[in-house]
Amino acid sequence: MTDRYAVFGNPISHSKSPFIHGQFAAPTQESLTYEAILAPVDGFEASLTAFFNAGGKGANVTVPFKEQAFALCDSISPEAKLAGAVNTLSLLADGTIRGDNTDGLGLVADLIANLGSLQDQRVLLIGAGGAARGCILPLLNAEIAQLTISNRTHTKAQLLVDIFTSVDNGAYASKVTAVEMSELAGEFDIIINSTSASLAGELPPLPAHIITTQTVCYDMMYGASITAFNQWALSQGAAKVIDGLGMLVGQAAKSFTLWRGIEPDTQVVLTLLRDKLMAEPK
């Protein structure tokens, strides 16, 4: 019997997930299908329920339904709990729904694939929205030395700090801080842009001096050409820039493993996806 999986979103026609999961499944002999489902903005729960009632086994969730998906779960992972959102749903044998958030796990996996261990790295996270929030616990669990969060609206960055410094009786309190963009100083080993500014060809208002010849810059956005943030980082002398395509493949791989118990080959699929992206009409 073929197991059904899907990604829910609105819009969803642009989704790379069906291609990615199809490539994951191909060499494993796993019998499954994976489709993109456009859910009405006010009809996500009904669409998801219909999918599960028709035999669906699991689903990915993207904008704008991640918070709604969180509310529908009977159980959630630690990453999902702290993110306040889920991107992966699993229908369990007892009929309950488990929610996971694999976004941050995908980011960390891609960083490690490119850089090796993240232990003792000083990380600057730009942005304080859902993308940033979902990545904080996985970054901290990767044993980084320090996480600085900076956002145009400083109160949002401080709110994230308050959430994560209260976790595990303050276990992370000394590792997470919020700093105004205009007051950023010192050196960072890794700078991560979690904002969508690059999609509009724009940049966060960052001081150039935070980038050194040792700094690696990571933009969660991606495209056929270099992103605006990464182009700026190179112009300021960054040692290396990475876009978010590997994070996309990485989070999908974590979902696939949760559902199938198999770890797919992400590098092969990333190469195929990069080639596919480059071949798309500009």
From Swiss-Prot:
GO annotation (BP), single: aromatic amino acid family biosynthetic process
GO molecular function: NADP binding; shikimate 3-dehydrogenase (NADP+) activity
Catalytic activity: shikimate + NADP(+) = 3-dehydroshikimate + NADPH + H(+)
Source organism, top-level taxon: Bacteria
Enzyme active site: K66
GO CC terms, sorted: cytosol
Family to which the UniProt record says this protein belongs: Belongs to the shikimate dehydrogenase family.
EC number: 1.1.1.25
Protein name: Shikimate dehydrogenase (NADP(+))
Pfam families listed in its UniProt record: SDH_C, Shikimate_DH, Shikimate_dh_N
Pathway info: Metabolic intermediate biosynthesis; chorismate biosynthesis; chorismate from D-erythrose 4-phosphate and phosphoenolpyruvate: step 4/7
Coiled coil, from the record: none
InterPro entries assigned: Aminoacid_DH-like_N_sf, NAD(P)-bd_dom_sf, SDH_C, Shikimate_DH, Shikimate_DH-bd_N, Shikimate_DH_fam, Shikm_DH/Glu-tRNA_Rdtase
Oligomer status and interactors: Homodimer.
Keyword Transcription regulation in annotation: no
Residues engaged in binding shikimate: S15, K16, S17, T62, N87, D103, Y222
Alphabetical UniProt keywords: Amino-acid biosynthesis, Aromatic amino acid biosynthesis, NADP, Oxidoreductase
Function: Involved in the biosynthesis of the chorismate, which leads to the biosynthesis of aromatic amino acids. Catalyzes the reversible NADPH linked reduction of 3-dehydroshikimate (DHSA) to yield shikimate (SA).
Source organism of this protein record: Shewanella baltica (strain OS223)
Binding of NADP(+), residues: G127, A128, G129, G130, A131, N151, R152, T153, H154, T155, K156, M220, G244
